[in-house]
A protein has these predicted regions:
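Extended hydrophobic leader/signal-anchor segments used for secretion and membrane insertion
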Residues: 1-158
């Protein structure tokens, strides 16, 4: 029974993002609530919301976060590598699972993170991009930093 419930929740999430992808394809920005911890510590699932803007085919800078579909699932992760025909993404809360997509498979660009306290983070500026790439390059110690972050901030917020 719990397995069915888990599948149902994932299906709803996928439908939710599919609707957002349709709006982005029509040229409309979307604001979404996000779930999951794959973008910790920068995006806290279940608390933060994000605004995505349509992708217009421009070359994306390293460090930007984008919405795309990979293996049938919608993701919002950070661009960490690129070549002539592909983008390679990795969630900030992940250590080693890269998602590779064709450049034209990007659906939207993360523009703003809306935090519960009313603060907003611009995710297209130089500071965000550089901070994200620094975070990417310290992968060997990220596991420990994420463990501390979860213990200090996520458990105390419950």
């Amino acid at each position: 029974m719990t397995g069915d419930l888990h599948k149902e929740i994932r299906l709803v999430d996928n439908q939710y993002f599919a609707q957002a992808a349709e709006r982005l394809a029509s040229g409309t920005a979307v604001r979404l609530s996000v779930m999951g911890n794959s973008m910790l510590p920068f995006i806290i699932g279940g608390k933060d919301q994000v605004t995505l803007v349509p992708y217009t085919g421009q070359d994306l800078p390293l460090g930007i976060a984008a919405l795309y579909q990979w293996e049938g699932k919608y993701m919002i992760h950070r661009l960490v590598k690129k070549d002539e025909s592909h983008y390679h993404f990795l969630g900030d809360g992940n250590i080693c699972r890269f998602e590779t997509i064709k450049r034209n498979e990007v659906l939207g660009i993360l523009q703003t993170i809306h935090h519960p306290d009313g603060k907003e983070t611009d995710t297209t500026g130089r500071c965000w991009l550089h901070l994200g790439m620094i975070w990417y390059h310290i992968r060997p110690v990220r596991r420990y930093l994420l463990f501390i972050f979860r213990k200090l901030f996520l458990r105390s917020a419950r």
